Amino acid sequence: MNQIEVRNVEKSFKDTKAVRGVSLTIQPGEFVALLGPNGAGKTTLVEMMEGLKKPDKGEILIQGKNWHKHEKELRKIIGLSLQETRFTEKLTIRETLRLFASFFKLGEERVNEVITLTELESKEKSYAGTLSGGQRQRLALAVALLNHPEVLFLDEPTTGLDPHSRLDLWNILKGLKDQGKTTLILTTHYMEEAESLCDHIIILDEGKILREGQLHELLDENSHNLDELFINLTGKKLSEEPQIK
């Protein structure tokens, strides 16, 4: 069974068509990168997959189930980390994770597991308000992993991070990939991030899929890497360095 199936989905906001007839399938255990410039429709597409927005047309199935009829079941297998995740500044990392774990009726054992998984042991007593950008992103990932999600959505998780913090997060995600139990859908502006982490690449622009497939299938004699492929498809350069936080 496909992990995710998107069938001819469309979404508009007033006079702007954000997503135009998108169809795709994602298999269990795949790490998928959604690439596109601002306004390409990738965030809207992901929010529909997450059940946060409803398509105007078409259907999205996760493990063969749609959000309309099976929201309660699907919430149990989904993890998500938004680009601007905010935490209560006066709670420590461990206290924050205990709070979110209580929503899933999970105990201290799972809190310990995600602290270890996201390499936050040395910071678990630090208050959220004192964390660096990289540490906040690792905390956001730890929260997203609490309920053992089968499908994990990350919205530009390393945007604005320094290169060292970015590499730390990549290594954590590579470890998650090696376990083979999680499907990841990642939006990113970093071609290197997509090439390093993901085996399934989807390039969007103006609400449509321009190219999709395995990385080695997408590259050819005219496009030796994702940067070149993206420029050839869109005439735009995606991987501009954002301001470091």
Identify the function of each model-found stretch.
Residues 58-69, 73-74:
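Conserved ABC transporter NBD signature motif
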